[in-house]
UniProtKB/Swiss-Prot annotation:
Protein name per its UniProtKB record: Histidinol dehydrogenase
Entry superkingdom: Bacteria
General function of this protein: Catalyzes the sequential NAD-dependent oxidations of L-histidinol to L-histidinaldehyde and then to L-histidine.
Residues that coordinate or bind substrate: S237, Q259, H262, H327, D360, E414, H419
Gene name per UniProt: hisD
């Protein structure tokens, strides 16, 4: 990894140091995704069969996972893995349940009551990618809050394997969260099916979950068309670590590598006021890389990542807030004392013994988080992501008499005569 001294960088160099790997969607990708979506929208299941055969190398007559397949998956998953997933579900449930939104009502004036009502989104679609490895943890992170929200229809799509089956761990994870409708579909075609619906796959109001560039582009296109809402902008995984001289270099290096191994386009950053620590982390990266099965991928990610020397920890937090990382690790002696300085991050990990991997799997927080700087305005997935909120107001005759004049003055100021008339008629006065 390249080592930089922040104090020696000019404005342009500082911007370059915090620039993420270029994420450009080629016109070819956009057009290919648009064609897939149009095909699925027009021909439904027939298109899904052809596309699945072409990209996944398997011919499927039926996309829905059967009860027998769920049972076979249950038998195939090792007991310790099932128990680990069950434990993770319990903690995810505990954390998300505590943060659930509730409606409220308030009398804003005598005879005028305003309310906020919370309702579950009716139909939601969850996407669990497979790629180079299945991700049952993503099924847990999406399935639990969907269940807590009370969504009446939850659909999950995940790519089939060459033999036409789905990874057993993903199926068990879905089952543990209460998801019973799982379809063997991957890629942009899965997103199109959940957005527009086919003979087999029901259309959904909102789509959730990560994926490759085709999945991400498909989510953007269906959202722009108004077919379905999506959870958040998606991008490659990233972590930023702020560490002081007392941090464990081996721990910091391990945390950087745990994100770097996600993909060649991932980015990891270390900000520290200690030259000694930065050098030690650099050495640890090489030591630990030698033992990683995905070392080649991690090295590609490290090539576009940085170890940055700062003058003070205050400066480190200013840089971090500018970057707005998906994951922020505070490898500091008094991490909670510094938490107030965090303004933008998807999820924060405090201290030497809170690796980002805990949040990925089983601490209880959600690992579906905003990336690419979106943490400045977006939050990670929660129960609220699966809910709608709408307002209600009720005014009595005395209530409108009390506040109607306010409405009349504002309506006249805006030149909206019909607005004024709607109030004046009820008050028995001239508009």
């Amino acid at each position: 990894m390249k080592i930089l001294d922040w104090s020696q960088l000019d404005v342009a160099a500082r911007t370059d140091a915090l620039t993420r790997p270029v994420q450009t969607v080629a016109a070819q990708t956009r057009n290919a995704v648009a064609a897939l979506i149009a095909d699925v929208r027009t021909r439904g299941d027939a298109a899904l069969r052809e596309i699945t055969a072409r990209f996944d190398g398997v011919s499927l007559e039926r996309f829905a996972v059967s009860e027998a397949e769920f049972a076979a998956a249950e038998a195939a998953v090792a007991p310790e893995l099932r128990q680990a997933m069950q434990d993770a579900v319990a903690r995810i449930d505990t954390f998300h349940r505590a943060g659930m939104s509730e409606g409220y009502a308030v009398e804003t004036a005598p005879g005028v009551v305003c309310e906020k009502i919370v309702r579950p989104i009716g139909r939601v679609g969850l996407y669990v990618p497979a790629g180079s490895a299945p991700l049952p943890s993503t099924a847990l992170m999406l399935g639990v809050p969907a269940r807590l929200a009370g969504c009446r229809a939850v659909v999950l799509c995940t790519p089939p394997r060459k033999d036409g089956s789905v990874d057993p761990a993903v199926l068990v994870a879905a089952w543990l969260t209460g998801v019973r409708r799982v379809f063997k579909l991957g890629g942009a075609q899965a997103i199109a099916a959940m957005a527009y619906g086919t003979e087999s796959v029901p259309s959904c109001d909102k789509l959730f979950g990560p994926g490759n560039s085709y999945v991400t582009e498909a989510k953007q296109q269906v959202a722009q068309s108004g077919a379905a809402a999506i959870d958040m902008p998606a991008g490659p995984s990233e972590v930023l670590v702020i560490a002081d001289a007392g941090a464990q270099a081996a721990f910091v290096a391990a945390d950087l590598l745990s994100q770097a191994e996600h993909g060649a386009d991932s980015q990891v950053l270390l900000l520290s006021d200690s030259d000694v620590l930065i050098d030690a982390v650099q050495a640890q990266l090489e030591i630990q890389l030698a033992h990683l099965s995905r070392a080649d991928i991690a090295r590609q990610a490290l090539a576009q990542s940085r170890l940055i020397k700062v003058q003070t920890l205050d400066e480190a937090f200013a840089i971090s807030n500018r970057y707005a990382p998906e994951h922020l690790i505070l490898a500091l002696r008094e991490p909670r004392a510094w938490l107030a300085q965090v303004e933008a991050a998807g999820s924060v990990f405090l201290g030497d013994y809170t690796p980002e991997a805990l949040g990925d799997y089983c601490s209880g927080t959600n690992h579906v988080l905003p990336t690419s700087g979106a943490a400045r305005a977006y939050s990670g997935v929660s129960v609220a992501s699966f809910q709608n909120m709408f307002s209600v107001q009720a005014a009595s005759k005395a209530g409108i008499a009390g506040i109607g004049e306010c409405a009349l003055i504002l309506a006249r100021a805006e030149g909206l005569d019909a607005h004024a008339n709607a109030v004046a008629l009820r008050m028995g006065v001239a508009a």
